[in-house]
Curated annotation (Swiss-Prot):
Belongs to the alpha-IPM synthase/homocitrate synthase family. LeuA type 1 subfamily. The gene is leuA. It comes from Wolinella succinogenes (strain ATCC 29543 / DSM 1740 / CCUG 13145 / JCM 31913 / LMG 7466 / NCTC 11488 / FDC 602W). Mn(2+) binds at D15, H201, H203, N237. This is 2-isopropylmalate synthase. PANTHER family: 2-ISOPROPYLMALATE SYNTHASE 1, CHLOROPLASTIC-RELATED, HOMOCITRATE SYNTHASE-RELATED.
Amino acid sequence: MSAEMIKIFDTTLRDGEQSPGASMNTEEKIRIAKQLERLGVDVIEAGFAAASPGDFDAISKIASAVSESTICSLARAVEKDIKAAADSLAPAKLKRIHTFIATSPIHMEYKLRMTPSEVIKRAVEAIAYAKSFMEDVEFSCEDAGRSDVGFLKEILAAVIEAGAGTLNIPDTVGYRLPHEMGAIIKELHEFVGNRAILSVHCHNDLGLAVANSLYCIQSGARQVECTVNGLGERAGNAALEEIVMAIKTRRDIFGGLDTRINTKEIYASSQLVANITGIRPQPNKAIVGKNAFAHESGIHQDGVLKHKETYEIMHASDIGLGEQESIVLGKHSGRHAFKDKIKALGFEVSYEELNAAFDRFKALCDQKKEIYDEDIRAILAEETSHIPKVYELVGIQLSDCSMGRPYAAITLKKEGSEEIVDAAIGNGSVDALFKTIDRISQIKGELKDYKVEAVTQGKDALAKVVVKVEFEENKPAIIGHGLHIDTMLATAKAYVGALNSYLSMRELMGKKKCEEERI
């Protein structure tokens, strides 16, 4: 007998992006969307089309780039939001509008200032309007976790009649315990029957998002909304990888249920989201944390070596992580072998990107004895970022900090111009680097976060630097990435990358403004 499928609705690009510091540009969102498609996600919530021109543009481009997953836009239960969602989804092969309105007493009274009957009327009108654009429409009861179940039944019956095919029950503030959420879903499942698919969207404020989601699946939910790495505002959302691997690992509990997720793509998806957002899972994070398959205890190590199942309930290879990080290529490896390795790692690159990445790889071979998969992933992530290079780092020179206040001299090449050289003194080498780049670009940035980590083990490991920089007050911080064996060079590259992203975003916003003024 074939298993009943649980739909995986990924909202990394919408709810996940609401995590502080996790903002992404359009090209980065497209890369994540294509990886989610490889992962086998059923529905990709690509954004909130009415929120900004940037969100609209990203959804539209993702809709063109992805064909195997349904592309979804969120919309409030108002016509202009729904129209924006429909327009942004026009290029999509498979598309869905996800509209919502709050249903809890506190939200209806204080936020909406509407009566329950007015809320039902608004919801029905929203579904009917969304259905005029496309067949697949989802409805969410915002703050359902604190809503009256009797009222939930009333509004769900009305939106089913209006044409909603999926009914989402969010625990918006992460308030409910598993048995409570399970009881709500069980009662609603018995009421709805096969008239629509029940969905859940659990937040992690009490650390229960995954537990609540799994309990709801057992109680009748057949779609679960989640994010890669549990990314999301406040304490985050239910983690996709934990839900999927729980269903896969506990066949004794979920035996008749399955997902379409290709679990071999879980690790690659986790790493991509972490690299782009700069938010890495904590080391002891289930499934994808770097300690998830590590055994330090001698007793545990002995048991695992004798028989893996003594202390491991799943294999690292199940999520696409090599159990031994193998040395993959060396200085004598050719372009063909490098291309095969890229394909094996799940990357799709253009001819130009392949050449650029291969050149970086050969240069790294001269600096490093052993090249690992993680080195190549890091190089590819940088070379496929598609951020316009308004400024390109040519070189840096740093003074000896022990001789007094350090200074940095930097050479940048501006697009279509000659090289520019300048220098500045700072409170440390990093500060001196950033001040010099600010002087050259004549744009002042304020550093909000700075992280450095080794890509692999060993003294000759590549340094990966992530910076978050605010170039304008009250605007989201821009993320920049830098990769080099020399940490200071990686730092300078990361800051220049953030600057280029900012300039690209500013140009895009300027074009959008001009278009709106013409209209």
